Amino acid sequence: TSYNAQEKVYDAQGKFTDEVVKNFVKDGVGIMRFGRLLDQPPFTHTEILNATQKYVIESNRHGIPTLYYGEALHGYMAEGATVFPSAIGLASTWDTELVEEVYSVAALEMRARGVTVAFTPVLGLARDARWGRTGETYGEDPFLVARMGVASVNGLQGGSYPYDQNHV
């Protein structure tokens, strides 16, 4: 029998229970993968993450929350989220304010669903067009990549969090 993602995470009464969460999280730690959670409507997506987070915090003696990650190469990659041009396309504008705005929208959409870590464009230089990740970069110009990297980090963090300048 084949089940869709919603059928797999809800019990027979249509509830997302602690028992269901325990199947995802052994001993309150580890890496969780919910399959095609990203295909779920925003409310369902958020409900699942919130229930899992509650379980993890309550089941470990230090109350340490889990980190949820999400792809944000050109907007948050999830059902109903905003999609923007690719990183290399955004870089071609040389518009750092635009890039900051793009990633502030992605951050808002991710936070609204409980996602705490964003996988974003590659800040390495694309020196060889044969590299499979070239389209996920801001290009080959060090000055441009640095400016776009700072703008994307500022957008994601809202300018309110310190970041390690050695890695931007």
PLM regions with names:
Residues 1-168:
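Glycoside hydrolase catalytic-domain context in secreted enzymes
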